């Protein structure tokens, strides 16, 4: 395979893990970061100890503080940053891009102020003439396991399947299997909203409830995700795949999950500010819960689990009381019409 340069915007765990994959595939990954300490550590020690402890990076993984240097000559630009920085980084990227480029984003969230998905934010901020294609790379994955080269599957979603196949070809190897799909909306809705349900799973575990409770929460949570997704144009079948139920399972059941860990602390009685300070990293589900709270009301979508998690996060609702209210809701038939 011909070596290709790929720029990765974001020196966190996911950006660094994807850079490792590209280096394993004999490509040339360049990470753009904004902290001297991390950029220097990647270049000099071939580690990123804050985000991926104990992982030794291939020497081919390089990092830079210069956005221009990172994207110069890159076939693909991967945007691997927290959702709250997406708009400002895309403004910078729009200024820096000199020619049409395949853009890939791996950020899972909804912009609270606008209810926009991340691809919509990117489309607003980056000129169409500079976007050869926009691909969502998502699925059941923890960066820690990708960096350890454990078997993982993802889905590259794009309206232009030929662009999705280019991304598939650059990242696929014996450890990372990539599928393609054309349902961008479904991939983004599944990836963003599962973080809310993962907070709920963590809360349930923190309260000491068992597997029955978590299984119910995940299953009915998936129904809520699908309801909203279909209402905004997703294919319901997408939620049965990697970017739907697959991503939900891994995020609700693993100690690697920031959202599960944050929820677990909340369930044990800590308040949100304490939890976020202890985490020291972005917990996307908190921001997404705020966005979806208003969005669901606007669309008149029934999302009782999501609403309960919002109330725990932002209205000081007691977690046990929230569970009692969910369990005491009016009886219903388990049937969805899509």
Curated annotation (Swiss-Prot):
Q: Which residues does the Swiss-Prot or TrEMBL record annotate as the active site?
A: 194
So which domain of life are we looking at? Bacteria
**Where does this chain mainly localize?**
cytoplasm
Positions binding sn-glycerol 3-phosphate in this chain are 108, 139, 141, 194, 247, 257-259
Query: Which InterPro entries does the record match to this protein?
Result: 6-PGluconate_DH-like_C_sf, 6PGD_dom2, G3P_DH_NAD-dep, G3P_DH_NAD-dep_C, G3P_DH_NAD-dep_N, NAD(P)-bd_dom_sf
Tell me what reaction this enzyme catalyses: sn-glycerol 3-phosphate + NAD(+) = dihydroxyacetone phosphate + NADH + H(+); sn-glycerol 3-phosphate + NADP(+) = dihydroxyacetone phosphate + NADPH + H(+)
What residues bind NADPH, as annotated? 13-14, 108, 143, 258, 282, 284
Q: Where in the cell is it found?
A: Cytoplasm
Reported EC number(s) for this entry are 1.1.1.94
Tell me yes or no: is NAD among this UniProt entry's keywords. Answer: yes
Which GO terms of the cellular component aspect does the record hold? cytosol
BP GO terms, sorted: carbohydrate metabolic process; glycerol-3-phosphate biosynthetic process; glycerol-3-phosphate catabolic process; glycerol-3-phosphate metabolic process; glycerophospholipid metabolic process; phospholipid biosynthetic process
Is ATP-binding one of the keywords UniProt gives this record?
Answer: no
Keywords, A to Z, come to: Cytoplasm, Lipid biosynthesis, Lipid metabolism, NAD, NADP, Nucleotide-binding, Oxidoreductase, Phospholipid biosynthesis, Phospholipid metabolism
- GO MF terms, alphabetically ordered: glycerol-3-phosphate dehydrogenase [NAD(P)+] activity; NAD binding
Pathway-wise, it operates in:
Membrane lipid metabolism; glycerophospholipid metabolism
Its function? Catalyzes the reduction of the glycolytic intermediate dihydroxyacetone phosphate (DHAP) to sn-glycerol 3-phosphate (G3P), the key precursor for phospholipid synthesis.
**What PANTHER family would the database entry show?**
GLYCEROL-3-PHOSPHATE DEHYDROGENASE, GLYCEROL-3-PHOSPHATE DEHYDROGENASE [NAD(+)] 2, CHLOROPLASTIC
Protein family per UniProt: Belongs to the NAD-dependent glycerol-3-phosphate dehydrogenase family.
The protein's name: Glycerol-3-phosphate dehydrogenase [NAD(P)+]
């Amino acid at each position: 395979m011909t070596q290709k340069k790929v720029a990765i915007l974001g020196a966190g765990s996911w950006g660094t893990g994807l850079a490792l994959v590209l280096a394993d595939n004999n490509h040339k990954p360049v990470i753009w970061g904004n902290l001297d300490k991390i950029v220097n550590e990647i270049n000099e020690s071939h580690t990123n100890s804050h985000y991926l402890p104990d992982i030794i990076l291939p020497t081919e993984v390089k990092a830079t503080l210069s956005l221009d240097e990172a994207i110069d000559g890159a076939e693909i630009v991967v945007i691997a940053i927290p959702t709250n920085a997406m708009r400002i980084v895309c403004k910078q990227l729009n200024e820096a891009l000199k020619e049409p480029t395949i853009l890939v984003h791996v950020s899972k969230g909804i912009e609270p102020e606008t209810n926009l998905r991340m691809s919509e934010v990117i489309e607003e901020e980056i000129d169409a003439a500079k976007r050869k294609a926009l691909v969502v790379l998502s699925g059941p994955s923890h960066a820690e396991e990708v960096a350890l080269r454990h078997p993982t599957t993802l889905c590259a979603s794009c309206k232009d399947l030929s662009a999705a196949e280019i991304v598939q070809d650059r990242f696929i190897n014996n450890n990372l299997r990539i599928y393609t799909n054309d349902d961008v909306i479904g991939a983004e809705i599944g990836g963003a909203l599962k973080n809310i349900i993962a907070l709920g799973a963590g809360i349930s575990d923190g309260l000491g409830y068992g597997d029955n409770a978590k299984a119910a929460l995940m299953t009915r949570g998936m129904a809520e995700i699908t309801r909203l997704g279909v209402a905004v144009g997703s294919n319901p079948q997408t939620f049965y795949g990697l970017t739907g139920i697959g991503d939900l399972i891994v995020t609700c059941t693993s100690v690697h999950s920031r959202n599960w860990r944050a929820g677990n602390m909340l369930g044990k009685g800590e308040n949100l500010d304490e939890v976020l300070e202890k985490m020291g990293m972005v917990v996307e589900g908190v921001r997404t819960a705020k966005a979806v709270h208003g969005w669901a009301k606007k669309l008149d979508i029934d999302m009782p689990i999501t609403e309960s998690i919002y109330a725990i996060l932002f209205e000081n609702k007691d977690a046990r009381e929230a569970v009692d209210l969910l369990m005491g809701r009016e009886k219903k038939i388990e049937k969805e019409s899509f």
